[in-house]
Curated annotation (Swiss-Prot):
This is Uncharacterized amino acid permease YecA. It comes from Bacillus subtilis (strain 168). Belongs to the amino acid-polyamine-organocation (APC) superfamily. It is a multi-pass membrane protein. It is found in: Cell membrane. Its main location: membrane. GO terms for biological process: amino acid transport. The keyword 4Fe-4S does not apply.
Length: 424
């Protein structure tokens, strides 16, 4: 029998990892940005997108019960269609996380410049340190990594709940009138931005083989995390609108202004701490899920089998993590040397993420029956993702190029069929 990933994750740790994967730095700026664009109506959009996120979560929860695999969403597509389809989706994902995660790290590190006059190279160094710490923790094993994630998420939730609580007394009903100052078109325009605040659920599914009871614990983790994330987003949007903490200052200043109404001048420092904690939690969870997905692809022979090795002592995909560290370094170096705009860098990975959701929902429509509530959730999510994907512009080509590269690789290599020794 081939060695397996170590089963050590509980539903508590799974919930923390899931929250970390979804709750990005967008929570620090989007409530104010969307309120500035759509007014109080932005709160309605946050509620609607929170509801839509349960469609995605419900579908993933059903799929995990069918195939609790380290392949995650690639395993579901493979099961629904064929091995090549799952492998091609895996190649699409190869072009998302390795670029997206360093961008997240840079975004979080950028917030430090609001309390210090950090130079660009210092911001890049801070981002690199966060990535390096996360990689090293994952190399030490999923148990330690999950415990750290749980601790960080507890700190984040405490700070956010405290910020909301101290702001509630300053909420006034008058700030919610008029509800639609810029019309429904403005409310619709912010929906795409808000949608990206609810992506990342799929990153917990590749950890299924490391849960004690994946069929029960993964769905529980997904639904608890979805409830927590939705509650935080909606309440933060509510107090942002109700205290009119938007439209007057820059991105981070809006949240700092909100927190300062209850916490005084320390608001900006609390905000920066939140930014760093949230950034680390996000990159940590994404590295966890993605490294297992790549390991599973190598295990199946869909990418070079060199990456299908586990550490003999920690049962972690050590070679994948090392390769990720190298790619992260290249992305940071490219950004530092050529000053590539982060928004431009993010367009490709964003399109790849949406494409992965479309493929996953299509797989669910085939695997689940129409009498299953998960089928209807998948249908709603499929339609929503397809519409959003159509607005990706030139980035539409990015997933297509990655898919073509994967198809070419499998065509030339023919897929490795030999059995592997999965332990170093």
């Amino acid at each position: 029998m081939l060695p397996e990933l170590q089963r050590s994750i509980t539903w508590i740790q799974g919930t923390a990892l899931t929250i970390g994967a979804v709750l990005g730095c967008g929570i620090l700026i989007l409530p104010s940005v969307t309120a500035d664009t759509a007014g109080p109506a932005s709160l309605f959009v946050w509620v609607f997108m929170s509801f839509l996120s349960f469609f995605l979560v419900g579908t993933l929860a059903r799929l995990v019960k069918i195939a609790p695999s380290a392949g995650g969403i690639t395993a579901y597509v493979q099961l629904a269609f064929q091995k090549k389809a799952g492998a091609i989706l895996g190649w699409i994902m190869l072009g998302s996380v390795p670029i997206g995660v360093p961008i997240i790290a840079l975004t979080g590190a950028h917030y430090v410049s609001y309390i210090t006059e950090a130079a660009d190279w210092q911001i890049t160094l801070i981002a690199g340190c966060m990535l390096a710490i996360s990689i090293l923790l994952h190399m030490r094993g999923i148990q330690l990594s999950a415990n750290i994630s749980t601790l960080v998420i507890c700190v984040i939730v405490f700070l956010l709940v405290t910020s909301i609580a101290v702001s509630l007394p300053h909420v006034t009903i008058a700030e919610f009138k008029p509800f639609l100052p810029h019309g429904w078109s403005a409310a619709g325009s912010v929906s795409v931005m808000i949608f990206f605040s609810f992506v990342g659920w799929e990153m917990i599914t590749p950890l299924a083989e490391e849960f004690h009871r994946p069929e029960k614990d993964v769905p529980l983790s997904l639904f608890l995390a979805a409830s927590c994330v939705a509650g935080l987003y909606i309440m933060l949007s509510f107090v942002t609108v109700g205290t009119h903490s938007y439209g007057e200052n820059g991105e981070i200043a809006s949240l700092a202004m909100l927190i300062s109404k209850g916490a005084g001048e320390s608001g900006v420092y609390v905000t920066v701490c939140l930014a760093l904690f949230i950034t680390f939690a996000t990159i940590h969870a994404n590295i966890a899920g993605f490294s297992r997905m790549v390991y599973a692809l190598a295990r199946e022979g869909h990418i070079p089998v060199f990456f299908g090795k586990l550490s003999a002592t920690k049962r972690t995909p050590i070679r994948v993590l090392t390769a990720m560290a190298a790619v992260f370094g290249l992305v940071l170096a490219a950004h530092g040397l050529f000053q590539i705009d982060l928004t431009t860098l993010l367009k490709g990975p964003s399109a790849a993420f949406i494409a992965s959701y479309i493929c996953t929902m299509a797989a669910a429509l085939k695997l689940l029956g129409r009498r299953d509530i998960g089928w209807w959730m998948a249908l709603g999510a499929f339609v929503a993702c397809a519409v959003i994907y159509s607005f990706s512009g030139w980035a539409l080509l990015y997933p297509a190029v990655l898919a073509a590269a994967g198809y070419f690789y499998m065509k030339t290599k023919g897929g490795h069929k030999k059995k592997l020794d999965h332990v170093l």
